[in-house]
From Swiss-Prot:
Pfam families: Arginosuc_syn_C, Arginosuc_synth. Homotetramer. It is found in: Cytoplasm. It catalyses: L-citrulline + L-aspartate + ATP = 2-(N(omega)-L-arginino)succinate + AMP + diphosphate + H(+). This is Argininosuccinate synthase. NCBIfam families: argG (TIGR00032), PRK00509.1 (NF001770). Keywords: Amino-acid biosynthesis, Arginine biosynthesis, ATP-binding, Cytoplasm, Ligase, Nucleotide-binding. Belongs to the argininosuccinate synthase family. Type 1 subfamily. It is an enzyme of class 6 (ligase). SUPFAM superfamilies: Adenine nucleotide alpha hydrolases-like, Argininosuccinate synthetase, C-terminal domain. The lineage of its organism: Bacteria, Thermotogati, Thermotogota, Thermotogae, Thermotogales. L-citrulline binds at Y85, N121, R125, S178, S187, E268, Y280.
Length: 409
């Protein structure tokens, strides 16, 4: 009886070749296709997998779970890798791998396989998730397999093999970039972008219009949160209202994209130590992250916020490096959920030519006291108390300066 392997399958050249290669090695290959919002023809992908040799194909719609359990969870900690990247690819990988493990368990498969390269981050994200959720599963990673590497030294070898085996290859002109698309973002890498001094051509961008070409008209959105989670979006001009999590996020993507929001061009540090240039389009999440952070400004205690902000870079790093299912992540999420208990209210954002600016906010749990904050009203605050406050904090500075200058106390 053949051993079963569940292959994370995209329908592209690499995973199609891997599927056939695994079949030839004697495996019963079950193809698994994850719909996380990419614009693919899933019917055609399923048909291609079956023709290539898969015994069964799972096409799983994970979009809603992606939004509620992954994107919104990352939002609780304002996750941004190296201060800029909103982690669109990294956040999707643990979800994809989790469902792959579930299918393997359901099918009684002994193996899981993926087509991630040996230079990138995704191999780590997939395999750490496999290990965390079912350490008994064996992993086949062809791009780290000496036999596979000896047979396929590059794209030409893959194409020749596909033609030899009758695997359909798209004849349409391929974009000269390596791209990853899901509901949260689309990323563009490789090609001319490998030169960090190269200014991307406008045709790189497929989701967003250039801010220069965006409408010369402000869009006002009112975004509602409960315990840090987005629950409603209202367009204050045309009255459009979205409360379903998936529809809400798709609407923010739509509004952000047509207004040139969410473009990012950066060189980042991959987990394995290689620097990589990525160009990203993340319109909806950019709007959410900005609005959420603004609401925290009136609802979160100062020290709690500052502690959370100290932990946020580590949170983003854990997501980027593939440690979504880890004890340290459980610890951080428990703390973040506690910190978000009063992050409830609404924020109005002005969206205009690539910019997202909070212009109003309200919360029933607001810690903002107009009288205390006023320049004109005392509001129970005794200004003379500030003298002692300053003296206490100045004491160590005075001592440090005296010692520095060589004086004795």
């Amino acid at each position: 009886m053949k051993e079963k392997v569940v292959l994370a399958y995209s329908g592209g050249l690499d995973t199609s070749v891997i599927l056939k290669w695994l079949c030839e090695k004697g495996f019963d290959v079950i193809a698994y296709v994850a719909n996380v919002g990419q614009k693919d023809d899933f019917v055609a992908i399923k048909e291609k997998a079956l023709k290539t040799g898969a015994s069964k194909v799972y096409v799983e719609d994970l979009r809603r779970e992606f939004v509620t359990d992954y994107i919104f969870t990352a939002l609780l900690g304002n996750a941004m890798y190296e201060g800029r990247y909103l982690l669109g690819t990294a956040i999707a990988r643990p979800l994809i791998a989790k469902r792959q493990v579930e299918i393997a368990e359901k099918e009684g498969a002994q193996y899981v396989a993926h087509g991630a390269t040996g230079k990138g981050n995704d191999q780590v994200r997939f395999e750490l998730t496999y290990a965390a959720l079912n350490p008994n599963l064996k992993v086949i990673s062809p791009w780290k397999d000496p036999e596979f590497l000896a047979k396929f030294k590059g794209r030409t070898d893959l194409i020749n093999y596909a033609m030899e085996k009758g695997i359909p290859i798209k004849v349409s002109k391929k974009r000269p970039y390596s791209e990853d698309e899901n509901l949260m973002h689309i990323s563009h890498e490789a090609g001319k972008l490998e030169d960090p001094a190269h200014i991307p051509d406008e045709d790189v961008f497929t989701w967003t219009v250039s801010p220069k070409d965006a409408p010369d008209e402000e869009t006002l959105l009112e975004i509602h949160f409960e315990n840090g989670i987005p629950v409603k979006v209202v367009n204050l001009k045309d009255g459009t209202e979205k409360t379903d999590p998936l529809e809400l996020f798709e609407y923010l993507n739509e509004v952000g994209a047509k207004n040139g929001v969410g473009r990012l061009d950066m060189v980042e540090n991959r987990f394995i130590g290689i620097k990589s240039r990525g160009v990203y389009e993340t319109p909806g999440a950019t709007i959410l992250w900005i609005a959420h952070r603004d609401l925290e400004g009136i609802t979160m205690d100062k020290e709690v916020m500052h502690l959370r902000d100290m932990l946020a870079p580590k949170f983003a790093e854990l997501i980027y490096n593939g440690f979504w299912f880890s004890p340290e992540m459980e610890f951080l999420l428990a703390a973040f959920r506690k910190a978000q208990e009063n992050v409830t209210g609404k924020v109005t954002v002005s969206i205009y030519k690539g910019n997202v600016m909070p212009v109003a906010r309200y919360s029933p749990y607001s810690l903002y006291n107009p009288e205390l904050s006023s320049m004109d009203v005392e509001g129970g605050f005794d200004a003379t108390d500030s003298k002692g406050f300053i003296n206490i904090h100045a004491l160590r500075l005075k001592v440090h300066q005296l010692v520095k200058k060589g004086y004795q106390r």
